[in-house]
Structures are given as C-alpha cells and as structure tokens.
Curated annotation (Swiss-Prot):
Protein's name according to its UniProt entry: Fluoride-specific ion channel FluC
Function recorded in the entry: Fluoride-specific ion channel. Important for reducing fluoride concentration in the cell, thus reducing its toxicity.
Gene Ontology cellular-component annotations: plasma membrane
Organism: Thermus thermophilus (strain ATCC BAA-163 / DSM 7039 / HB27)
One of the GO BP terms on file: cellular detoxification of fluoride
Lineage: Bacteria, Thermotogati, Deinococcota, Deinococci, Thermales
Taxonomy, superkingdom: Bacteria
Main location: membrane
Transmembrane region(s): 7-27, 31-51, 68-88, 97-117
InterPro entries: FluC (IPR003691)
Length: 127
C-alpha cells in the first residue's frame, strides 16, 4: 500500500474530526445539555453516510481511493464510539439509568437502521 493511501486516510480523518467538532457543538448548543445529542446525531449521520458510501463503492461508483478517503478517513474521524461509551458511563454514574439505556441501545438501533437505509439509497442511486 502506497503512502498516498495513508495520506488520504489521514486527511479524511482530520476533515471528519473537524466536521464532528463543529457540527457536534452546533447540535449540542441547539438542543441543550442533559443528553449527549451531539454524539447521537453525528453517529447516526455517519452511519447513514457509511452505508451509502460503501454501497456506492461496491457498485463501482466510487474508486478505492475515494472509499478510503470517505469511509475510513472522513467517516472514521466523524463518528465516535469512544464518546458514546464514555457518555453512557457518565449517565450511569449520574444515576440516570433510563437515559443511559435509551442512549446506548437507541444509538445502536438508529445506527444500524440508518446504515441500512444509506446502503439501500446507494443501491437505488446506481441501480
């Protein structure tokens, strides 16, 4: 694997992290504290976009380099499982068991659903 591929992933990851920070700050500022809305939003959007991106890649509508940049780089930097884990733990430690369970399982369900919908949309766009 050439150094160019690593650079694509690194640049995409930097872009994805910047997008997560900016969009996350806007979402949390808009919806308020008390629930990790920003992480839920970026992970849900990222799940949809990874489904779409990977389907387009599988159908040949994206090159291998575009897939690396978008799926591994941008969306890898955009989504965050570690924040989901930490925020769930913080809710549990704060005694908010119901919120923690809703957040953890809701995030998983929403992520899977949106990845599926993105995948289906990708198929419809090229099929």
């Amino acid at each position: 694997m050439g150094v160019e591929r690593y650079l694509l992933v690194a640049l995409g990851g930097a872009l994805g992290s910047l997008l997560r920070y900016g969009l996350g700050a806007w979402v949390q500022g808009s919806l308020g504290a008390g629930f990790p809305w920003s992480t839920l939003f970026v992970n849900a959007l990222g799940s949809f976009l990874i489904g779409l991106t990977l389907r387009l890649s599988l159908e040949g509508a994206l090159s291998g380099e575009a897939r690396l940049f978008l799926a591994v780089g941008v969306l890898g930097g955009f989504t965050t499982f570690s924040s989901l884990s930490y925020e769930t733990l913080a809710l549990l430690q704060g005694g908010e068991v119901g919120k923690a369970l809703l957040y953890a399982f809701g995030s998983l369900f929403l992520g899977l659903l949106l990845a599926f919908l993105g995948y289906r949309l990708g198929g419809a766009l090229v099929g």
